[in-house]
Amino acid sequence: MNISLKSKNALVGGSSKGLGNAVARQLALSGAKVTLVARSKDLLVDTVNELNKLTECKHEYLICDYNDHEKYSKIISQYLFNNRIDILINNTQGPKSGDVNSLSIKDYQKAFDLLFKNTVYTTMLAIENMKKNSWGRIINMTSVSVKEPLSYLALSNSMRSSVISWAKTLSNDIGHNNVTVNNILTGYFDTERLKELNSDKAKSLT
């Protein structure tokens, strides 16, 4: 399928590597101007330089740590205040792994900020311009765990399910503005995150 996203601006979270990086690349190759968001400057620079050579747009990046909501919110709010975003891809690294018995309330709070609070904060800022332009696409990268919880991923199971419910509520509230909200329930992909989770689980069994 040939999709043209020329004149569209996209913001892609967690896009220095893994699925986020793959999504950012495909959006850029489809004609969108892409702003990549992640912690690793070196990886972001490499990707942006590559995409700038492959496409007609001048792509950008933001260095943000999703684990620090206060700093993240300042950077992302300033960017969205000065830039129009048509396509928002909410994606970030997963929270700490572990079963219910191994987690503290502090762990739950950190996971809430990482997966839910950041998603809501970014989306609500981006929505304003989408509503003004009567066009917007919001996509949340979640997990198959929202359908069937995965073992040793108590935090991810809980917080991603919250994102799903919130996204459905949001779609009901803003759909009349021609702004759509969708969730992608990702499965098992050969990424560094999956290797990390497998290693953590193996250690817990020894």
Predicted segments, located by residue:
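Residue(s) in the substrate-gating loop at a strand-loop-helix junction
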Residues: 143
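Conserved glycine-rich Rossmann-like NAD(P)H-binding loop of the short-chain dehydrogenase/reductase
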Residues: 32-46
